[in-house]
Regions:
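Metal-coordinating catalytic core of metallo-dependent amide/deamination hydrolases
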Residues: 1-69, 104-117
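Hydrophobic pocket-lining residues within nucleotide cofactor-binding pockets
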Residues: 10, 96-97
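His/Asp/Glu-enriched, well-ordered alpha-helical/loop segment
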Residues: 48-59, 66-89, 93-94, 100-103, ...
């Protein structure tokens, strides 16, 4: 046929600056609203499993550390359900990643896609983020792509790279 899809993009959460990143711990700036994923967990898992079963690549937008964690859980479940499949699933815009999830990317063969422009933000933007997360949490979890380079295909900048230069702000 004329049209063929090879992947599915699923948005699980949005940017922390708007209090829309799905987090393991609350924001530190006094925000008391509840952040929910775009899709309920069970529905997201069903979508991932169905796409995986059909041989489609999943590209899931997971900015917050809870979104990353649940995205990895969904990929792990799909892998157990369809063990013999070749796959190349991605978590995109991975801005916050908890320590316990770092090795899971390698174990599951999941690519953690990041945005180089956001990985090296302007000083004012970092100050804003420090208001949303305490400095220790921000330093520990924010953009692991800057500090966790290692052998393996799991840290390529990709989803937004065509719009973001390697040298943000020409630094």
């Amino acid at each position: 046929g004329f049209f063929r899809a090879g992947s599915v993009k699923l948005i699980m959460n949005l940017v922390p600056e708007a209090h829309q990143a799905w987090l393991l711990e609350p924001y530190c700036d006094g925000y008391e609203g509840e952040v929910k994923p775009v899709f309920p967990i069970e529905e997201m898992r069903e979508i991932v499993a169905a796409a995986d079963r059909l041989g489609l690549q999943m590209n899931m937008v997971t900015i917050g550390d809870r979104a990353v964690h649940e995205g990895l859980n969904a990929y792990e479940l799909a892998t157990r359900e369809n063990p013999e499949m070749l796959r190349r699933h991605t978590l995109e815009h991975t801005e916050l990643i908890a320590d316990e999830d770092l090795e899971r990317f390698v174990t599951l063969g999941v690519t953690a896609d990041f945005n180089p422009m956001v990985s090296y933000p302007e000083e004012g933007h970092m100050e804003h983020l420090e208001g949303l997360f305490d400095t220790e949490r921000l330093n520990a979890r924010y953009h692991r792509g800057r500090t966790s380079w290692r052998p393996g295909p799991w840290w390529p900048p990709g989803a937004t790279t065509p719009w973001c230069p390697w040298t943000p702000s020409c630094r």
